[in-house]
Each structure stands twice: as structure tokens, then as C-alpha cells.
């Protein structure tokens, strides 16, 4: 239902009272695109995977929304949820690190900035990790690094394809060098995975920056990206001030990186699952259970 249809429906069924209007606004009935400012009925926007029908802008989605978009129904088994961050450095800025962790957990319902687990995709076994930017900017601390390392090691041991969906501002400053060490740990686990000739696919979403870009995010055998995702290490302003020169237009976008060979393919969100499924098939990842695609999935495969 778009905006015009909604107004027609309201005209037909009568006007809303002031209380009803306030309730619908408060309940988030409408979603405004941050790119083109188009207004969309929230349920329709979510059914469209949080992609603006007007301009194609890909809104950020959290891990709880992303996982069902990718895995087979009833196949997801979370791993390492019990791992929780503490405060090894006693870090304080405006707020203490434990306070920030508590606020992030209350806001997102997550225990840290990544959710990991085992699942199947079209009946093929995968080890999937999905980062959530809402949790302290998707920053990588010791728990995020540990979960990724364990996930990849489990994928290697069980001969599963590893898939990581990245969304991060980089290393978590509240953990200092303990956060930076995770760059090496995750990279080492992925090198062992590659040495065992197992597949790793990295999916870069908006934004993927800092220490995550400098480590596991760019180590995929195949690197996919969502349209117009910001991908880089330092920010544009920092680089321009350091180099004292203007950067090219579109620098640090998925399209720029694709043009210069750092990304293999840009994939719209609706096509991400069928694209991953096709990659698994082409790389010989066998099915462990029968898979019967829905009519929508069958149509998507035919269109590829």
C-alpha cells in the first residue's frame, strides 16, 4: 500500500480521530527513506527487505532481520551466545564501558555486535555470522573476534562454507589492543579454512570500515557488496586532511571498489540469498537435506 492508496482508503472509510493519528505515527506506521525522503507503509517497506521502492536505497537491517532472509526455515542454530564482553581495561569516557554495553544490549536485544550460527541454505550447510551496526557501531571487540574465530574453526572442522555479513565501524576502542588482536585471530582462522580448501564468502554492507575492512572482511574467496555501501578503512575527511588533496567522486563506495577490482559483485538485497545459493552450488557444497524451493525462490533462480 503506497501513500496515495492509503489516503484513498482513509477517505473511503472515514477520517481518523486525533488520537488515532497520533497512535499510528507513534507506532511507526510509516517509514521515511533517508535517501529520497519518500514515505512508505512500514509493513510494505519491511516486506521489501527494507529497500526503498522509489530510489532503491538499502536501509540498514539488524542481524535478527537479516538471518531469516538468508537461511532455510527452521535450520538456524545460534552458537556462542554465552560469550559476553567485560571491561578488561576499566575504560571510561563520558560513560563507562559496562554502561555502554548495557545500553547497547537493551537497545538491540543482542549480547554483542555479531550473531553467529549454523544453518542450511537450500539444504547446503553453512556457518553464518551477521554483524549488527546498531550494537556500538558494529565494532569488533574480543567477543566479536572470538565468535568469528570459533565459527570459522567450526566451519573448517565440519566442512561447511563460511559466510560473514559485515557491518562495522572498525575495532572497539574501549578494548584497545585486545580489539586489534582480533584482526590477526580472525584472519588466521580464515587462512586455515582456505588451506583446507573450504569456501568463504564475505558480504559487505553499509558501512564496512576500519579494522574489519583491514582483516576478515576483505579475505573472502568471493566478496559481495550491497549497492552504495560505504567500504573503506579511514574516513574520507581524515584521508583528505592527511593527503591534503580531494578524493575521487564516489570514493569508498561499493561501486568504486567494484570498478577497481576489490569487490567481485554488487548484489541487491533481494538477490543475495539466490546469489549465495548459486555460489554454493558452483563450488560443490553438497546438500545435506532435501530442499524444496518456494515459488518465489524458483522464479528468482530462473531470472538469474
Swiss-Prot record:
This is Acetyl-coenzyme A carboxylase carboxyl transferase subunit beta. It is an enzyme of class 2 (transferase). Its cofactor is Zn(2+). Acetyl-CoA carboxylase is a heterohexamer composed of biotin carboxyl carrier protein (AccB), biotin carboxylase (AccC) and two subunits each of ACCase subunit alpha (AccA) and ACCase subunit beta (AccD). GO terms for molecular function: acetyl-CoA carboxylase activity; ATP binding; carboxyl- or carbamoyltransferase activity; zinc ion binding. InterPro entries: AcCoA_carboxyl_beta, Acetyl_CoA_COase_Trfase_b_su, ClpP/crotonase-like_dom_sf, COA_CT_N. A zinc finger (C4-type) spans 33-55. Pathway: Lipid metabolism; malonyl-CoA biosynthesis; malonyl-CoA from acetyl-CoA: step 1/1. The gene is accD. Zn(2+) binds at residues 33, 36, 52, 55. HAMAP family: AcetylCoA_CT_beta. It comes from the Bacteria. Its EC number is 2.1.3.15. It comes from Gloeobacter violaceus (strain ATCC 29082 / PCC 7421). GO terms for biological process: fatty acid biosynthetic process; malonyl-CoA biosynthetic process. Residues 29-298 form the CoA carboxyltransferase N-terminal domain. Binds 1 zinc ion per subunit. It is found in: Cytoplasm. Pfam families: Carboxyl_trans (PF01039). Component of the acetyl coenzyme A carboxylase (ACC) complex. Biotin carboxylase (BC) catalyzes the carboxylation of biotin on its carrier protein (BCCP) and then the CO(2) group is transferred by the transcarboxylase to acetyl-CoA to form malonyl-CoA. Keywords: ATP-binding, Cytoplasm, Fatty acid biosynthesis, Fatty acid metabolism, Lipid biosynthesis, Lipid metabolism, Metal-binding, Nucleotide-binding, Transferase, Zinc, Zinc-finger.
Amino acid at each position: 500500500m503506497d501513500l496515495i492508496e492509503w489516503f484513498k482508503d482513509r477517505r473511503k472509510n472515514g477520517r481518523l480521530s486525533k488520537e488515532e493519528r497520533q497512535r499510528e505515527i507513534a507506532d511507526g506506521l510509516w517509514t521515511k527513506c533517508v535517501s529520497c525522503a519518500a514515505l512508505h507503509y512500514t509493513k510494505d517497506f519491511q516486506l521489501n527487505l527494507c529497500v526503498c521502492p522509489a530510489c532503491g536505497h538499502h536501509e540498514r537491517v539488524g542481524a535478527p532481520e537479516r538471518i531469516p532472509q538468508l537461511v532455510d526455515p527452521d535450520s538456524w542454530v545460534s552458537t556462542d551466545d554465552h560469550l559476553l564482553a567485560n571491561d578488561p581495561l576499566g575504560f571510561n569516557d563520558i560513560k563507562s564501558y559496562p554502561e555502554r554495553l548495557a545500553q547497547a544490549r537493551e537497545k538491540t536485544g543482542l549480547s554483542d555486535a555479531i550473531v553467529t550460527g549454523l544453518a542450511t541454505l537450500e539444504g547446503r550447510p553453512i556457518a553464518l555470522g551477521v554483524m549488527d551496526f546498531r550494537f556500538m557501531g558494529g565494532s569488533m571487540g574480543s567477543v566479536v573476534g572470538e565468535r568469528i574465530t570459533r565459527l570459522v574453526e567450526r566451519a573448517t572442522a565440519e566442512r561447511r562454507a563460511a559466510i560473514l555479513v559485515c557491518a562495522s565501524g572498525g575495532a572497539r576502542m574501549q578494548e584497545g589492543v585486545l580489539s586489534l588482536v582480533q584482526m590477526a585471530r580472525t584472519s588466521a582462522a580464515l587462512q586455515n579454512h582456505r588451506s583446507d580448501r573450504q569456501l568463504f564468502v564475505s558480504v559487505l554492507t553499509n558501512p564496512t570500515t576500519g579494522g574489519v575492512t583491514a582483516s576478515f572482511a576483505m579475505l573472502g574467496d568471493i566478496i559481495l557488496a550491497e549497492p552504495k555501501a560505504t567500504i573503506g578503512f579511514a574516513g574520507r575527511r581524515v584521508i583528505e586532511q592527511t593527503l591534503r588533496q580531494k578524493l575521487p567522486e564516489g570514493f569508498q563506495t561499493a561501486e568504486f571498489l567494484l570498478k577497481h577490482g576489490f569487490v567481485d559483485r554488487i548484489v541487491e538485497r533481494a538477490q543475495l540469498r539466490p546469489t549465495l545459493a548459486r555460489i554454493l552450488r558452483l563450488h560443490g557444497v553438497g546438500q545435506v537435506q532435501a530442499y524444496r524451493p518456494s515459488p518465489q525462490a524458483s522464479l528468482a533462480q530462473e531470472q538469474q
